[in-house]
Amino acid sequence: MVFEFVLSLFNSVSGNHKIIGISYLWLAYWFGMIGFYMSVLIRTELGMSGLKIITMDTLEIYNLLFTLHGLIMVFFNIMTGLFGGIGNYLYPVLLGSCDVVYPRVNLYSLLLQPIGFVLVVSSVYLEIGSGTGWTLYPPLSTSLSNIGIDLIIFGLLAAGIASTLSSINFITTFASIKTIGFVIDRISPAAWSIVLTSFLLLLSLPVVTAVFLMVFFDRNHSTMFFESSNSGDPILYQHLFWFFGHPEVYIMILPGFGIISLLLSTYTTKEMFGNQTMILAMGSIALLGCLVWGHHMYTSGLEADTRGYFTTVTILIALPTGNKIFNWVTTLQCVESIKSLGLILFAVLFIVNFVIGGTTGVVLGNAGLDVVLHDTVYVVGHFHFVLSIGAIISLICFIVYIQRMLFGIILSNRLLSLMAPIFMIAVLFTFLPMHFTGFSPLPRRIPDYPDEMWGWNFICTLGATMMLVLKLTVLFIISL
């Protein structure tokens, strides 16, 4: 029944924002499953010390796995699901509009997503692939002679064009609202999160588009923008990429903030505490997020004054972030009735994960500590807590919120209440030990490690296996 419903969505060319939003969610689901299976392969290799699945002759496969895992989950799972899915399905409803201003542009954006995905994934089948890491740093990305890097670049450009079109559409829709009684500070934080995300995309996507094209010309037309032996500067690539890369973090998580705020106010039958301050906090985070890209580059030789600036501004982001946490927790206090305990439990999981990830982020924001921890799995544990798991939990919450439209069924509150603690245990097993092994230090992006690290890595693999079993169980339930 579910698969027939999905086929009917993609077989009908429709400009309706809800149909497009649901189509985005299904695309994000299948993209995410492929990316998740890649991470399971990575964790399977790391489950025991020594090379088990990967051999000395096939080490490039490991590089391919974590490269494609990062690209798929960032650009085709989280962005497609949160920005495309939530934005298209919910945003016009929250603004009191019947649809977005340009429905057909929405449809074109949707069709570009699978095109970009196919281009990125097809890079695996060409020669030695393109295991450069998801950041595509030169000179590694410019020195590989195969066409795989070029396919990744064009795939990401296609996804970027789709996001740009959606951003213009959402901002234009916001600017053209003529709803009676429309008051700008009474708009739901969920709607504001889409608006702020759209502005961040319009600010940062032209930069990363330019830098990807510069890499393409370096590779194919000998322009040498990033070739240090010919007056190029590879550090320039890092500055330009992370000027997009750090706002990208908030591009992915801001819609999650909005949906958690919406769910708390809906299912606790209470108005969101501090609605205006929540909007201001998200705006402050979006602004400060554009000013801290250098904290990803502490190991690249930044001078002391520059490190001090980026450290200070990074710590400042904790203030509006703490304000959001305070608003959510206060909304949950003294609740008289809860409509869906399962969804509220997932919202609480989001808050807990974000607090853990934010706390470890304050550690990494310190330049002196980051130099030591930057190339360890501590960083992997941090951004999976604060970004990946937080974004996935908010996406799960939204999917359950519209489950009748998406699946044609309703998952019981008892099932959701059972899934939430199991999911949290799996997440803690998978990513919490990485903080301990990161201090050892255990390097990231390496398929082997000393035998004394086996216990922690086995726990991480056990947690990843639990998440895999949980995902397959839920897929089986909704396919009945």
UniProtKB/Swiss-Prot annotation:
GO terms for cellular component: mitochondrial inner membrane; respiratory chain complex IV. InterPro entries: Cyt_c_oxase-like_su1_dom, Cyt_c_oxase-like_su1_sf, Cyt_C_Oxase_1, Cyt_c_Oxase_su1_BS. It catalyses: 4 Fe(II)-[cytochrome c] + O2 + 8 H(+)(in) = 4 Fe(III)-[cytochrome c] + 2 H2O + 4 H(+)(out). It is found in: Mitochondrion inner membrane. Heme a3 binds at H382. Its cofactor is heme; Cu cation. Its EC number is 7.1.1.9. Fe(II)-heme a binds at H69, H384. There is a cross-link at H246-Y250 (1'-histidyl-3'-tyrosine (His-Tyr)). One of its GO terms (biological process) is mitochondrial electron transport, cytochrome c to oxygen. Mg(2+) binds at H374, D375. It comes from the Eukaryota. It holds the Pfam family COX1. Ca(2+) binds at E45, G50, P447. Cu cation binds at H246, H295, H296. Pathway: Energy metabolism; oxidative phosphorylation. O2 binds at Y250. Component of the cytochrome c oxidase (complex IV, CIV), a multisubunit enzyme composed of a catalytic core of 3 subunits and several supernumerary subunits. The complex exists as a monomer or a dimer and forms supercomplexes (SCs) in the inner mitochondrial membrane with ubiquinol-cytochrome c oxidoreductase (cytochrome b-c1 complex, complex III, CIII). PANTHER family: CYTOCHROME C OXIDASE SUBUNIT 1. Component of the cytochrome c oxidase, the last enzyme in the mitochondrial electron transport chain which drives oxidative phosphorylation. The respiratory chain contains 3 multisubunit complexes succinate dehydrogenase (complex II, CII), ubiquinol-cytochrome c oxidoreductase (cytochrome b-c1 complex, complex III, CIII) and cytochrome c oxidase (complex IV, CIV), that cooperate to transfer electrons derived from NADH and succinate to molecular oxygen, creating an electrochemical gradient over the inner membrane that drives transmembrane transport and the ATP synthase. This is Cytochrome c oxidase subunit 1. It comes from Theileria annulata.
